[in-house]
């Protein structure tokens, strides 16, 4: 399959040789991405990104001041979003079996959110912490073969059950490239820079999902990372905003928005979607 990508977002790297060769996407480090904060959308009539980010920041602080605790709601929305990913292949084991799995995943996610927020008081937001949270989130017999708490050491691809490394519409970074990309992301997360924190949160969320460091559970991992980043930056104090619910309600623009960055380099379009989602979370 011929893969089209914009050099602003990254490039495709050829791995292996002969019949086992495949191409995987390598994202540009976020340190290289400069967002046009005056971008006003495709029609030039929408609020500038920086103004929208400031407005979203006010909204989040107001929500946080309400003091609501939404851990269970966030967990439920995160699991629903990941289970509803179009490319996910669900086992045909009947509704009751699937519901039991979702219930286990939801309970695990509640524990992971609470553990993560507690850990921020003594640990930096890092790959080590995310691995620990992934281990908590991926408990249960149905997750045993998904390497809980470990970064993947094999290629994965996004597609349906008929796709292969050759035909899949998207292939995240190969293991070596993934480790380098995650290291760059970790440095970006903890860098002392002048990027607006909510614009930075949008970029971090995108980058984590495109890196896809785990065999499974990356959707929940991305939601955890976003929530913890907002806490680490002092924007939230706990689980006060259910952003995964908005993503779940707007699944199509959420997933196409992530994909469009790779294809066309439209980071600004993704950032706008993310900020607008925060405004209604």
List the model feature ranges, each with a label.
Residues 1-281:
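FIC/Doc superfamily catalytic core
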């Amino acid at each position: 399959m011929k893969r089209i990508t914009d050099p602003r977002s990254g490039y495709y790297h050829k791995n292996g040789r002969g019949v086992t060769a495949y191409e995987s996407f390598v994202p540009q480090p976020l340190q290289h991405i400069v967002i046009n904060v005056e971008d006003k959308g495709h029609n030039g009539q929408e609020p500038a990104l920086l103004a929208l980010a400031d407005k979203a920041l006010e909204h989040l602080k107001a929500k946080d001041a309400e003091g609501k605790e939404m851990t269970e709601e966030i967990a439920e929305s995160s699991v629903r979003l990941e289970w509803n990913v179009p490319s996910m292949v669900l086992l045909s084991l009947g509704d009751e079996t699937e519901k039991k799995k979702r219930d286990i995943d939801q309970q695990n996610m509640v524990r992971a959110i609470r553990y993560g927020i507690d850990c921020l008081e003594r640990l930096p937001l890092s790959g080590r912490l995310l691995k620990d949270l992934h281990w908590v989130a991926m408990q249960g017999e149905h997750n045993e073969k998904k390497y809980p708490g470990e970064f993947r050491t094999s290629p994965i691809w996004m597609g349906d059950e008929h796709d292969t490394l050759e035909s899949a519409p998207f292939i995240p970074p190969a293991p070596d490239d993934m480790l380098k990309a995650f290291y760059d992301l970790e440095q970006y997360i903890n860098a002392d820079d002048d990027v607006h924190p909510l614009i930075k949160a949008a970029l971090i969320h995108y980058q984590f999902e495109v890196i896809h460091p785990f065999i499974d559970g990356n959707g929940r991992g991305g939601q955890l990372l976003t929530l913890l980043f907002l806490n680490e930056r002092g924007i939230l104090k706990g689980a006060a905003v259910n952003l995964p619910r908005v993503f779940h309600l707007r699944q199509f623009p959420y997933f196409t928005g992530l994909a469009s960055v790779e294809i066309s380099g439209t980071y600004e379009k993704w950032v706008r979607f993310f900020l607008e989602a925060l405004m209604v979370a």
